[in-house]
Every structure is written in structure tokens, then in C-alpha cells.
């Protein structure tokens, strides 16, 4: 019978990989998890959690505007709207990162408490029972691939050089004055709401006639109207044909205006 370093090696310490590894260890297996970043995965580090934190923060600008109609204001404000307010983007990102550190630490503790070894580095499968991390090779009876997904750039000239993905959008050190978002799926729509809420001039460019393709038609129409009412500039029936800088994009119509 073959001898291995571990019963199970999991590549990826996201929600799925951590859970599977803990369950296996709980049944007596010797388990290692290989992770090139830190425990948490897409949801905790680059997806649901940081995005929802920014989304929640962006909603307060609308609350301030609504408050004016209910008599709230500052007699000493310089703003014509009656309320003087500002936003510390750097402070928001710092606090967001602190929360991600806390949650990643919880994932690390879950692995430690289950007796799962965490191996830092990028795992490369070298055989049916072997994975290389750096210069060292590890063996296991079973290898579980739980690496999740990763955003990609469309094959459009200049986009990869001058654009950013959702990963980088969550790590910006400053709030852009203006931003163009290509696509109108739920992730793009969420980011449009985030940057618009924080005061960025926001463009949403998409090929379809309405955002959120595949969703209920009435919902899509209502969403488009609500986004425009909030000041988001919609570009339906368009695609990006090239990018020359972060602030200069070329677009053209993909169908005639009727």
C-alpha cells in the first residue's frame, strides 16, 4: 500500500476548501491546505464581504440627501444643501481591511482547531498524488481542487493595461472622480451603485438593452430607471472597443437607435 504525506491535500483556503478540510480532519484524516494568499477565499477577501461593506457605506449619501427634506441641516454649513459633510475614503478602506483581517483570522483558527496544516504558497499538481509548492513536493491519497474563480479582462485593446477588475476596485487607495464600468451583471451593477453613492461620476456600458440579463424584465426596467434617477449614466447597446487610459474609453453602438 502506498504511503503518502497526507490523506487529503486541498488547494485553496476559501469557504469550500476550509469546510471540506475541516470535515475530513474531523473524520480522522490527515489534511493539509495549500493557499497562496491567506484563508478566506473570494467571498471573504475579494467578494461578498468587502463589497457589501462598501455598498453599505455608499448608502449614507442618499440618506443625507433625504434628511434635508425632513428638516435636518447645519446652520453653519457652507453647502447650499444645508448639510456640510465629507467622506474619508482612506479610512473606509483601512477599516474594511481590518475586518477582512479579523475574518481571515477566524478561518485560520478553524483550520488550527481542526488540526489541519496550512501550507503557504502556490500549489502545482505534478502527478495523481503529488503537489509542488515552491521547491518542495507533497503527496496525498486524495487532492481536492478548491481554487474558486478569478475575474478576467475582455479581449479588448488596452483594457488589461489600463483597466482594473473587481479585485482592484476593492483596494483603491483613492475614490476616482469618474469611472466607467463595462458590463451590467449583478457585480457591475453593485459597483456602479457603490461608486455613485460615494460621489464618483459613474458610467455603465453594456451590450444589452437593459442591465441584469436573465433577470425578470420588470425588475430590469425598474432598476435602469432607479439607477438613472440616482445619477448613474447608462450606455445600453454599447461595447468598449479600446482603452487608452483610465479616463478615456472608446465606445460604439452595437445596434441602431430607433
Predicted region positions:
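Glycine-rich flavin
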Residues: 3-6, 22-29, 34-175, 208-212, ...
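Beta1/beta-strand and adjacent pyrophosphate-binding region of the FAD-binding site
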Residues: 4-13, 177-182
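N-terminal Rossmann-like FAD-binding beta1-loop-alpha1 element of flavoenzymes
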Residues: 8-32, 192-196
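Rossmann-like NAD(P)H-binding beta-loop-alpha module
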Residues: 174-207, 214
